[in-house]
Structures are given as C-alpha cells and as structure tokens.
Amino acid sequence: MAKGYLIVNVYSDTIANPVENATVTISKNDKEIVAINTNEDGQTEKITLDTVDKSYSEEEQHETRPYETYDVSVTALGLTPTKIEGVQIFDEITSIQNIYLTSIDENQLEDISEVTPNTLWGEYPPNISEVEEEKEEGIAPFVLREVVIPANIIVHDGTPNNLDAPNYTVPFVDYIKNVASSEIYSTWPIETIKANILAIISFTLNRIYTEWYRSKGYNFTITSTTSYDQRYTRNGTIFEPISNAVDEIFNNYIRVGIRLEPLPAHYKSSTTEDGYLSQWGSKDLGDKGYNALEIIRYYYGNNTNIYEAELTGPYPYSFTTILRQGDCSQDVYTLQNILNYIRSSYPGIPVIENPSGLFNSDTTEAVKKFQSVFGLTSTGTVNYQTWYMLSYIFTAIAKMTNSIYS
C-alpha cells in the first residue's frame, strides 16, 4: 500500500507559543492508529500513514479519491481538547497539520473542525465572473498606490452578504499555502504548482490592490468561497511541496503589459475559456516540461510577466543580503540575536554563545534547526525566505510578550 507522511505542529493560540508534550492521536473510523507526544518545539516526529496511490491524483477523471483522510486529536494540560477531522494524506507527500489550542472553556468540552475536500474532488459552487458581479453591485473598486504584501489579510468564511459568517485574520503566506493546498494536488510537477501559486497570489493581491470588498463597505479582504474568490479551508492541511514553493515565491505576482495592478488571475479545474488557467491543463503542461512562466503565458498571454511586491507590516528587520557561514557583519550579529530571542519560545534551537557578528558553525546549526522547525529547506544559509520567517516569528513572540508593539 502507498505511504504518506504527517507532521503535527501544536500551538497555544499563536505560533509564538508551541506546546510541549501535547498528546497527538491519529485515528480512522474511530480506531486509534498511533499516539505520540510533541517535542519541546511543539512538533511531532514524521508519522507514516497508509494512503492511495499517487496515480489517482494525476488523472482528471479518476473515480477514486486521490488521498486518504485521518482524524487528529490533541490534548494538553490546561487547554481545550481539539480534533481536526479529514486531515489529508497523499502518496509520498509530507502533510503538515497546524493545530491551535485555546484555553479551557467550561462550556466547550472539545473543539472540533473539519478539513473540507480539495476543490478538484469536492463539489463547490461555480465562480461568479467579476463582470457580472460589477453589474450587480454597480460600484467600481478603489485602487491603492502600490502593490504590497501585507502581514495579514482578513478572510470572510462565507459569501459576502452572510453576516453570520466569521472573519479570520490570517498571515498572508499562510493564506496562500492554505488556498494552494485546497485548490490543487501536491503531487503535481513543481512548475505546475508554482504557476498555480502565482495565479493565487495575483488574484489575492488584486483583491487587496483594488480594495475589492472594502470599497463596497465590507470589513474583510477576501472570502473563502469559490463563488466569489478562492477556497480557504479553516485549519486546512498544508502540503510540504506547496509550502516550500510558496516560501520561495510568495512576493511574486503576475502583471499584464504596462498595467500596474496584479492580474486578477482566474482559474478553473478544467476549462478552455479564454483568460482562465486550467488547473488540470497546467498539470499536463508541467508534465511536458513547461516552466511556471511558460504555463502562465500559455493561459494569460505572452505579454504577462512576473514582478516582485514589497513587504509591509510590523517587521523590524529588513533583508539586505544572503548570509552564510564565514560572513562577518552587523547583519550576522542581528541574526544571532534574533535566533537567541526566538529560542525563548523554541528551546530546540541551539543557543549561540556570545554573538559577535561572525557566522560560525554554531550559527549554522541554529539556522538549520530553525529552518527545520518551520518547514524551510535546512541549508544553514539565510536567504530571503528564511529571513522573512525569522522576522515573522520574532515579531509574533515579541507581540506575545509585549516586548514591542501594543
């Protein structure tokens, strides 16, 4: 039987507060398969689980669901027991399930949520075109001065006019990983995955740039429904190939010709409609050796290009250059102090004794451990993606401890 893998990360409220020694139980059909405790960084070891063959995720018309599902239950002292149903496991892929526990509420015995099916497998309402939506609303969107990557976006978990649906504040990068994991299959060629991620990012940034919903009086950035936007799954499973690709290109987006705004890059599972990316079609192009930009141009036109957006948000340290062992600079000194600070919440990261600004072997080991904990490629070299994550985690911990920002 095919095998897939699962890593569970357990936090108390935020990523700044990992939970050590939480009990994680994996079950299927109410039968326990494995129970394991989290380590000092709130993480389980990689768990091997049975699943279906990856060929089912490579054929559009297959009648067998291309992944297996399991339930994950977590208990920890002083926190509400939590259960995520329908955690998805693909053949040869590592799934990442982040679980956020809350303080015990005497009115809630257990917090239960479900990972809904991937949009390529489940049944979801068709998208309403923006032209038709504009006709209905009769309102033109605003535009911002520049294209930026926000720290967070607000996701409305329902249709725009459903006032009972909750709003969730989600880190931008986490949102993109969630949508991509909900919309495509992680077993596909990496260039196909990147092309779809670029479409997802561009669509999202267009919603931000045009203030699509806020200009109409709504208090959110985007919805979770495929009727209007793209699928966001609360507590959804994230897949390692998708996570790694997002970390690599999260600040990239598509533009057409000399137009400044991000392309509102529409896509469907299978379509020949002009101006839409076909998800299954992009998989076929990836199989043929097309790279991400070639796939993008195949669907959106040869005058499309990829641009980088600036980051905005409460990040106290900007990226300047790649850092590696042997470097000696103020940036290295800052890096060493950031790592030691993060270690206050993640004690599995080795301490760097007497930070001096010299990128020594101790610094390399600390960087490798940090990268491993947060799902980055463990090279020991600090690139843009690692620096962004360092700054993000530093800020989250600082907020939790009220060290910076009110």
Where are these regions (language model features)?
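Surface-exposed coil/turn segments at beta-strand junctions on protein surfaces, enriched
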Residues: 1, 37-39, 63-67, 90-92
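Structural motif
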Residues: 2-3, 7-20
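Clustered cysteine/histidine zinc-coordinating segments, centered on FYVE zinc fingers that bind PI3P
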Residues: 2-3, 27, 47-49, 57-58, ...
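Intrinsic-disorder/low-complexity, polar/charged segments enriched in Ser/Thr/Lys/Arg/Asp/Glu/Gln
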Residues: 3-5, 43, 96
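Short, ordered, surface-exposed loop/turn motifs in non-cytosolic proteins
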Residues: 14-33, 37-40, 332
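Conserved, single-site charged/polar hotspot
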Residues: 21-23, 37, 47-49, 73-406
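Short, acidic Ser/Thr/Gly-rich low-complexity loop/linker segments typical of extracellular
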Residues: 31-58, 348
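A short, solvent-exposed loop/turn motif at the edges and junctions
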Residues: 54-85
